[in-house]
Regions:
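Generic low-complexity segments that are intrinsically disordered, proline-rich and/or Lys/Arg-biased
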Residues: 29, 95-96, 103-104
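Hydrophobic membrane-insertion alpha-helices, especially the h-region
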Residues: 4-22
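Acidic/histidine-rich, surface-exposed loop or edge segments in extracytoplasmic proteins
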Residues: 17-21, 101-117
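Exposed beta-strand-loop-beta-strand "reactive/processing" segments of non-cytosolic proteins
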Residues: 47-96, 144-198
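Short, non-transmembrane alpha-helical segments in secretory-pathway proteins
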Residues: 23-60, 116-157
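Generic intrinsically disordered, low-complexity segments enriched for polar/acidic and small residues
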Residues: 16-19, 24, 66, 88, ...
Length: 199
């Protein structure tokens, strides 16, 4: 009799444990948890990155009817340098098969528009690199070499003077009385103008 009662109690405890384990999802399913989990993962995978930010989050439904979030993040290394590296990282939450998509390199090794036949300067990092690597930017390239503390600020503009759809990238240095601004076309792989100013 005692054995039967003990077996019944163990069975009840086992069923209760199974119910608790399978009733609650392994990953909490809300947007804030997805963002938190993703940012923690980015901090671990890219500990030296200066910028790690979520650009987009979308809730989707998989073929089996379960809900998940698809996230896209920006990771930038060397944002204060002439050659910042920008990576886009994609992630599904909860993770599917624990196989993530490979990161997409937007800029790498001081190059823009990697594997793109027609270059569109869509991001700050691209504009900064283009401002001293495109044809016609020799003055800025020399300025950067002569001033190790040179830094750039980039602004996307709908219009500037007679130009439309441009980036303005201004290079300045505390150790120089000069600054340079490159006016770049967003879509034509072209330097439209180099402006030299005395500070």
């Amino acid at each position: 009799m005692k054995t039967v009662v003990l077996v019944v109690l163990l069975a009840i405890v086992a069923l209760g444990a199974i119910y608790i384990i399978f009733q609650q999802p392994a990953y909490p399913m809300n947007e804030n948890d997805a963002k938190k989990f993703f940012l923690e993962d980015l901090r671990e995978k890219y500990p030296n990155a200066g910028i790690r930010e979520i650009m987009d989050i979308t809730q989707l439904t998989s073929s089996d009817g379960s809900s998940y979030y698809q996230l896209k993040a920006r990771v930038t290394n060397g944002e204060g340098t002439p050659c910042p590296e920008r990576i886009h990282v994609y992630y599904d939450y909860p993770p599917k098969n624990y196989v993530s998509q490979p990161p997409e390199y937007i800029t790498k090794s001081c190059k823009v528009c990697i594997n793109e036949p027609h270059c569109i300067l869509a991001f700050t990092e691209e504009a900064i690199i283009a401002s001293h690597t495109y044809n016609g930017t020799g003055e800025i390239e020399k300025f950067i070499k002569d001033n190790s503390d040179a830094a750039a600020t980039a602004s996307a503009m709908d219009s500037y003077g007679n130009y439309t759809g441009v980036w303005l990238v201004k290079w300045s240095s505390p150790s120089s009385a000069l600054s340079y601004t490159a006016v770049l076309s967003k879509t034509q792989n072209t330097v439209l103008e180099i402006i030299k100013e005395s500070n």
